[in-house]
Amino acid sequence: MKNIHINARISFGEWDQELQQDVIDFVNYYISGGSLRAVADPSERVSSLIAAALEGGAARAYRQEIGGVITELRQLTELPGFSTELLEQLAAEVSRLDSGKLRALAPRTTRNNQVDAYVNGPQCLEMLLEEIAKARRYIHLSVMLFFNDDSGNRIAAALLHALDRGVQVRLMVNYTVTALGYGHNLAVGRFSEISDRLEQAGAKLQDTFHSYYSAMEWSRRRAELKAQGIPERILFLQDKVQEDVELTGLNVIDHRKFMIIDGITSIVGSLNIGDQYTFATPIEASASVQVDGRPMGVPVREEEWHDGCFRIRGAAALPLNAVFQSRWLLLGGDFYDPEDALYRSEGNTDFGSEECTLFVSFPGNPVNLMQQYYLDLITYAADETVIVNPYLIDHAFWDRLSGLGPERSCHLTICNPLEVNDHPTNRAAVRSNMYVPFCNGVSFYDYSATERFSHWKITYDHRSHAVFHGSYNINERSACHDFELGLLVKGEAFAAKVKAMIDYDLSVSRKITDKREFFKHPWMHPSTYVNTATRNYT
């Protein structure tokens, strides 16, 4: 391992870029509650150094005030309780940690990206097809569901054209869950009809349903991967999955949704591929509200869902491709190195002004950084904060929200499809838990007023001009059982555009004004117990 220091302190002047990043990663990870056992043995010394500085929560509150993540050395020096002496002592201890593992667990930040937001099927489908058509070297796509319907086949056709141009195509899809189809239509679940065509044309595919090995299988597979040169920072990720999963692994889902093209373009979202998400039917468009020249609106058909994604141009593609690589190799895919010239940008990656921080989680992770982001977002709310999410079934979220006083609650707005929802217990979870937060000042909007389902997952934090978007649901599955991925974007102009999108959704939703729509005494309602019994499952 590089930079093994034995001094009690390492002065700022001696910090190279690698050590600086390691200290930032460590502090972010530890403030969020991450266990050091995954990256240090023994870890008592470094834990004792930082524990006193974190007492009282001032450092955590400051981190949320600046957007939810520390991204530079200056912010480290401004953390309450973190003196120069403490940071220099931490540097000496952090230099002994396994930086590869630490970086796999901590958020990854890039700067000077250009980010654009898209909502509803037509916008997202058009953009996806355009970006695939531009690909010249490679396309890496990870998605939970890829349906054999109109838009699914249009995207498949675009991938086939890319293969004809000599573009490398790698896909990770959950074949088994896709096979369930939607709307009582099993035919749309026949992804094998698409995958067969793609494989015959030269694409490489992996089924993410097989994310767990038996103990014997993993022991053998781990030895094979290690012999092939796969680094420990990747292998230990599957170790954690193996330790966490019970029996069969059937309750593990790769829920991530992202794409990387040519090392320069990334797409991150909450949508899958198929007519529920990437439908081509024109929306019922607003006559007056547009963002970047694209109209806001509501899906016309009941079976079409409101959803969205971000397109990012810039350096964010590199850490995203590293995430793809780790899953790809652990699933049995062919080796590739995201640092190779083929997979990096061919030129300048400065496309804009947005700072992008990538968050990932997986079954067995020492701490779920996305869950912790949401908890801190509400705990330290001091300005307008909006959360849009389809499923509100995370007990930790509700406990934290119910414990807030009016001085925090008054800044919070939640938008959720309360009545029109594909999860049978979302309504019960909200009605059983929202009474106290509502009385304390949290605003609640029901997107069901549109008679459509919103699958969009996004937050807006006015204080730090930050937006968070990705696959993460506010439920027990995303918090504990699934592979998830999200992007925190900081930038005033971009945040304002996303806020305009959210404001449109709020304008077509129903604002709940009567506290009696929520349960003052949840224990009196049978649905409360059904929600409690099933909250760990899809």
Predicted regions and their residues:
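Charged, low-complexity intrinsically disordered terminal segments
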Residues: 2-538
